[in-house]
Structures are given as structure tokens and as C-alpha cells.
From Swiss-Prot:
Heterotetramer of two alpha chains and two beta chains. This is Hemoglobin subunit alpha. Belongs to the globin family. Keywords: Heme, Iron, Metal-binding, Oxygen transport, Transport. Gene3D superfamilies: Globins (1.10.490.10). The gene is HBA. Heme b binds at H87. InterPro entries: Globin (IPR000971), Globin-like_sf (IPR009050), Globin/Proto (IPR012292), Hemoglobin_a-typ (IPR002338), Hemoglobin_oxygen_transport (IPR050056), Hemoglobin_pi (IPR002339).
Length: 141
């Protein structure tokens, strides 16, 4: 459960991310594909080369969804219901992949905003990403 401090921390750091959804999203996906190559199986039709238009577009979608989640931080299930159903029923993404992506999101935020990612903010953002992952996997049950 996210505390009020966690929510404030997430909103504060995300305000710095919000202007870079495509760039950071693409970077997070590229990191995930490199660090966890098994995740590539969900994207057989993508050009997975650095900076590809498909990675940039999908990265923007991923970070736009996270942006929406931040904007609805008090109702993550409502904000992410459609995506949860899509990933569980249509795409059948293995739930562990959400944790892989969350790790890469944290790394990207740390690289671009090192001064903002204090230990407390890091913990809050990690809790938020875990909550998002939990909601996205809720339809698997």
C-alpha cells in the first residue's frame, strides 16, 4: 500500500519524467531487451535495433500508461483495468516481465534524474511500480 508520502514522492519524480515519455520509455525497453533477452519473444514483429521507431512508439505507450497510473494513483485498478485484461488474456505476457520492466524504469529514472532519486523516492517509486505490476497481473487469476 502506498503511503501519502510515497504518493507525493512518486508524483514529484514523475513530474520530471513526464516531458520525456517516448525517450525514457524507449530506453527502458531497450534495457529490458538487453538485460532480459527472453522478453523479446513478445515482440517478434518489432525492429529491436537501437532507436527503432517501433521501440520508441511502444516505449511511449508504456510510459504514457505509467503517466496515467501516476495521475490516478489512488485508483490503479481502475486506471489499468484495460491494460491488465489485454496483457493477461490477449497478449499472455508472463507476469515476471513486469518486474523486469519495472527494474529498467528505475534505472532510467536514476540515470536521468540522479539528484531526485533519493533513497526515499527510490523506495516509493519501486513500491509504485510493484503496485502497477500487481494490478497488471490481477486478471491472471
Amino acid at each position: 500500500v502506498l503511503s501519502s508520502d510515497d504518493k507525493c514522492n512518486v508524483k514529484a519524480v514523475w513530474s520530471k519524467v513526464a516531458g520525456h515519455l517516448e525517450e525514457y520509455g524507449a530506453e527502458a525497453l531497450e534495457r529490458m531487451f538487453c538485460a532480459y533477452p527472453q522478453t523479446k519473444i513478445y515482440f517478434p514483429h518489432f525492429d529491436l535495433s537501437h532507436g527503432s521507431a517501433q521501440i520508441r512508439a511502444h516505449g511511449k505507450k508504456v510510459f504514457a500508461a505509467l503517466h496515467e497510473a501516476v495521475n490516478h494513483i489512488d485508483d490503479l485498478p481502475g486506471a489499468l483495468c484495460r491494460l491488465s485484461e489485454l496483457h493477461a488474456h490477449s497478449l499472455r505476457v508472463d507476469p515476471v516481465n513486469f518486474k523486469f520492466l519495472a527494474q529498467c524504469v528505475l534505472v532510467v529514472v536514476a540515470i536521468h534524474h540522479p539528484g531526485s532519486l533519493t533513497p526515499e523516492v527510490h523506495a516509493s517509486l519501486d513500491k509504485f511500480l510493484c503496485a502497477v505490476s500487481s494490478v497488471l497481473t490481477s486478471k491472471y487469476r
